[in-house]
């Protein structure tokens, strides 16, 4: 999934420095990914640590992490399940009616793919409530649908707007592919809570923080993934069909510094790592001044290519600086 703030390309940098600071052997460690997103960082440490605690405010993220982090054993008959969901007949449901030209002025998906999403989503729910699948298989199928639907979405990566014409990838027919995950012998925990509240209930060894960098709320940028995941009817509003959504204090310039310091103050973890770039709402000095109050602070930086939701959009620079702020409490 092409995701704003994804750390996929930075995983080697993050892993190298976490191991260097904490330990090369993390087999007994509890690792918390508090702003998990698609779970890419937690997935990188899943086999290396004793337990992953994964959390995000958004439900689509909860679904992805229940699969990638929460699932630790092979799903029985997963190929048969994928084939069963792939074979369902088209259905004109909520996505078709509100997010394709077949039922609205919105063109997030082709008419065929919108019907496929509706049919597949309803089939997954049917399998769950008929008790033909357990929660592990349910989240595997639902995560597979989110990943597969995202590949044929008619957007410039985020769902804040749709494209006027169907791009080539959006013209391809949706095919459900399994969202495979790493197996593990250790049970993990997955939450969908406000980070400021969850931090009071958990503890561990390594806390990895990757909060939003700017004022764009993820609930708005990825609203359609939430809509597919929850599949709860509502009245879509405006040109983009945006539902009501939760707002993070980390996307507010007026609230972020206080929210960040409260998080650090309450954290019961020895090692804290914060990923943040040089264009975020918090400045490098502001972050450093807060972290220095609570222990030994250091900073490591890396220059890398910026994320572009729209390749045609002009930017001042092609690269951005990723900062890994490190605190040992």
Question: Residue locations for each model-derived region?
Answer:
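S-adenosyl-L-methionine
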Residues: 1-34, 40-48, 63, 71, ...
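Conserved proline-anchored active-site loop of SAM-dependent methyltransferases
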Residues: 31-45, 54-59, 201-221, 275
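Class I S-adenosyl-L-methionine-dependent methyltransferase module
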Residues: 51, 57-182, 215, 219-253, ...
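A polyampholytic, Gly/Pro-enriched intrinsically disordered region
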Residues: 74-84, 210, 316-328
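Class I S-adenosyl-L-methionine
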Residues: 163, 284-329
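Conserved SAM/SAH-binding loop
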Residues: 192-197
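Conserved Class I SAM-dependent methyltransferase catalytic core
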Residues: 250-298, 303
């Amino acid at each position: 999934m092409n995701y704003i703030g994804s750390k996929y390309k930075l995983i080697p940098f993050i892993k190298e420095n976490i191991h260097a600071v904490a330990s090369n052997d993390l087999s007994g460690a509890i690792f918390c990914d508090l702003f998990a997103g698609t779970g890419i960082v937690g997935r990188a440490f899943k086999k290396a640590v004793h337990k992953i605690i994964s959390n995000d405010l958004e439900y689509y993220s909860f679904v992805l992490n229940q699969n990638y982090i929460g699932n630790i054993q092979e799903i029985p008959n997963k190929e048969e399940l994928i084939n069963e969901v792939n074979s369902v007949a088209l259905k004109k449901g909520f996505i078709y009616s509100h997010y394709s030209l077949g039922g609205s002025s919105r063109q997030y998906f082709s008419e065929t793919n919108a019907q496929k999403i509706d049919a597949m989503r309803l089939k997954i729910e049917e399998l769950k409530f008929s008790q033909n699948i357990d929660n592990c298989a349910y989240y595997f199928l639902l995560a597979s649908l989110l990943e597969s639907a995202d590949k044929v979405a008619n957007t410039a990566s985020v769902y804040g707007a749709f494209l006027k014409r169907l791009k080539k990838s959006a013209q391809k027919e949706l095919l459900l592919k399994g969202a495979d995950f790493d197996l593990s012998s250790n049970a993990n925990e997955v939450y969908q809570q406000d980070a400021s509240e969850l931090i009071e209930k958990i503890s561990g060894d390594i806390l990895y923080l990757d909060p939003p960098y700017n004022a764009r709320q993820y609930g708005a940028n990825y609203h359609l993934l939430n809509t597919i995941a929850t599949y709860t009817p509502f009245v879509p509003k405006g040109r983009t069909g945006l539902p009501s959504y939760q707002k993070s204090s980390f996307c507010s310039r007026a609230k972020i510094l206080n929210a960040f310091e409260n998080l650090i103050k309450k954290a019961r973890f020895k090692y804290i790592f914060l990923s943040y770039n040089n264009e975020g709402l918090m400045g490098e000095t502001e972050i450093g001044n807060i972290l220095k109050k609570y222990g030994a602070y250091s900073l490591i930086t890396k220059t890398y290519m910026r994320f572009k939701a729209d390749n045609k959009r002009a930017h001042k620079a092609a690269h951005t600086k990723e900062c890994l702020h490190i605190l040992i409490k």
